[in-house]
Amino acid sequence: RNNATDIIIMKQQNQKELEKIIEEFGDLFGTGDNFKKLYNEAMKERYSFLYLDLQTNPAKAYVRFEKQIGEGDKLLF
């Protein structure tokens, strides 16, 4: 994960796993709360996923590969 440039996060069935993911990537999007909002926005539709582009500075978050919903600590929805 340290060398990852792109991350795809599917819906998590286990709350502890989601908390670990938030702990790992939350700071890239300001706070863990911001990251959880991004995750929840991405999971609204069935079979959706959260895509994180970590190559950019600041990092960007997308619903699938289609709609940008976050850039650094800014939420875009």
Predicted stretch roles:
Residues R1-P58:
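Conserved ATP-driven motor cores of ASCE-family P-loop NTPases powering translocation/secretion/packaging/pilus
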Residues R46-F77:
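Conserved P-loop NTPase motor module
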